[in-house]
């Protein structure tokens, strides 16, 4: 009887310690400016409740989202919209600081952006489309979660320089895989914050929706990390890469191009070549879907071309979608 009580007590201590060790983001540094994140164990008891840039999930505490097929996977359980918005320039760095993270909770980190339209404070986060801007997992036998612990419980990402300005929801999460060998054993720790991104970019990458982006049998979600694995597939789409405009063959335009002016030499072959190479200059919006083919979604035709005599002149053309 005594041994049963001792065993039960020990198991309770293990569970309690694991619950206490679950982490949340407590601070966010945005281009050198600090913001306190929503504090699930403090803010609900303050009068008035502090306004934050991060969405609150007071009812969930620091517990993980186990069932990623529910709306809880978007911004955590019973998430409520944040009242404030942080201003940030495209190309700036954002650092997320966690309060704690147990060494046993090995796994990847992932960060997404979603364009909210007019206002992130009134949007339904489950209706948005999220494009990944950063992720890290297992590299050279070391999990990124261990690096986060070693780096003062912090992780830094960079806002892509070429994305279009606007209101964005940033979604940041750690995924713990210590129980991921069982279905729904993977533990997600997502959070969201409101951003207003400034810049001169024109890119609107395609995205995925939550729930829906992750599947039960994804190799990065249903996985036994104790099998001495050498490689690990991070869940979700690949991160958007600003540098891959001409190196990757997977851009697809959704822009409607009405007119353009291109400087060319007096050569019909050069005109055709320049129109092809100058496609990026003509389009106002790009998206980057998960396809291996470079496609122009909007077909276009030259309605008029006038090239005066001379070695180098301008011509005007109308590009019709």
From Swiss-Prot:
Family indicated by similarity: Belongs to the polysaccharide monooxygenase AA9 family.
Glycosylation sites: 78, 152, 266
Molecular function as annotated in GO: metal ion binding; monooxygenase activity
Subcellular location: Secreted
InterPro entries to which the protein is assigned, alphabetical: AA9, AA9_LPMO
Source species: Geotrichum candidum (Oospora lactis)
Top EC class of this enzyme: oxidoreductase
Binding site for O2: 178, 187
Enzyme Commission identifier(s): 1.14.99.56
Protein name as it appears in the record: AA9 family lytic polysaccharide monooxygenase D
Binding-site residues, Cu(2+): 22, 105, 189
Signal sequence bounds: 1-21
Annotated catalysed reactions: [(1->4)-beta-D-glucosyl]n+m + reduced acceptor + O2 = 4-dehydro-beta-D-glucosyl-[(1->4)-beta-D-glucosyl]n-1 + [(1->4)-beta-D-glucosyl]m + acceptor + H2O
One GO term of the biological process aspect: cellulose catabolic process
Function (record text): Lytic polysaccharide monooxygenase (LPMO) that depolymerizes crystalline and amorphous polysaccharides via the oxidation of scissile alpha- or beta-(1-4)-glycosidic bonds, yielding C1 or C4 oxidation products. Catalysis by LPMOs requires the reduction of the active-site copper from Cu(II) to Cu(I) by a reducing agent and H(2)O(2) or O(2) as a cosubstrate.
Cofactor note: Binds 1 copper ion per subunit.
Biotechnology remark: Lignocellulose is the most abundant polymeric composite on Earth and is a recalcitrant but promising renewable substrate for industrial biotechnology applications. Together with cellobiose dehydrogenases (CDHs) an enzymatic system capable of oxidative cellulose cleavage is formed, which increases the efficiency of cellulases and put LPMOs at focus of biofuel research.
One Pfam family cited in the UniProt record for this chain: AA9
Alphabetic keyword roster: Carbohydrate metabolism, Cellulose degradation, Copper, Disulfide bond, Glycoprotein, Metal-binding, Monooxygenase, Oxidoreductase, Polysaccharide degradation, Secreted, Signal
Coiled coil: none
Cofactor(s) needed by this chain: Cu(2+)
């Amino acid at each position: 009887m005594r041994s049963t009580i001792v065993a039960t007590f020990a198991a309770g201590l293990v569970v309690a310690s694991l619950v206490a060790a679950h982490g949340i983001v407590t601070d966010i540094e945005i281009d050198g400016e600090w913001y306190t994140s929503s504090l699930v164990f403090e803010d609900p008891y303050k009068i008035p409740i502090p306004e934050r840039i991060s969405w609150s999930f007071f009812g969930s505490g620091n517990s993980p989202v186990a069932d990623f097929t529910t709306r809880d996977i978007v911004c955590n359980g019973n998430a409520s919209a944040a009242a404030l918005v942080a201003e940030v320039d495209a190309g700036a760095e954002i650092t997320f600081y966690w309060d704690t993270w147990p060494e046993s909770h090995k796994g990847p980190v992932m960060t997404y952006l979603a364009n909210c339209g007019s206002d992130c404070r009134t949007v339904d986060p489950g209706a948005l489309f999220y494009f990944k801007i950063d992720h890290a997992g297992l590299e050279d036998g070391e999990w990124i979660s261990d690096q986060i612990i070693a780096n003062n419980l912090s992780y830094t990402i960079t806002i892509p320089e070429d994305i279009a300005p606007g209101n964005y929801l940033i979604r940041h999460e750690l995924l713990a895989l210590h129980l991921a060998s069982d279905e729904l054993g993977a533990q997600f720790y997502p959070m969201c914050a409101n951003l207003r991104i400034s810049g001169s970019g024109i890119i609107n990458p395609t995205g995925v929706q939550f729930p829906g982006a992750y599947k039960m049998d994804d190799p990065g979600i249903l996985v036994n990390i104790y099998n001495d694995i050498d490689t690990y597939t991070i869940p979700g789409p690949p991160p958007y890469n600003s540098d891959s405009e001409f190196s990757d063959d997977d851009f697809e335009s959704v822009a409607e191009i009405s007119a353009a002016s291109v400087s060319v030499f007096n050569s019909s072959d050069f005109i055709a070549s320049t129109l092809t190479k100058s496609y990026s200059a003509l389009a106002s919006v790009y998206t980057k879907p998960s396809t291996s083919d470079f496609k122009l979604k909007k077909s276009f035709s030259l309605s008029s071309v006038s090239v005066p005599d001379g070695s180098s002149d301008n011509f005007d053309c109308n590009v019709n979608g």
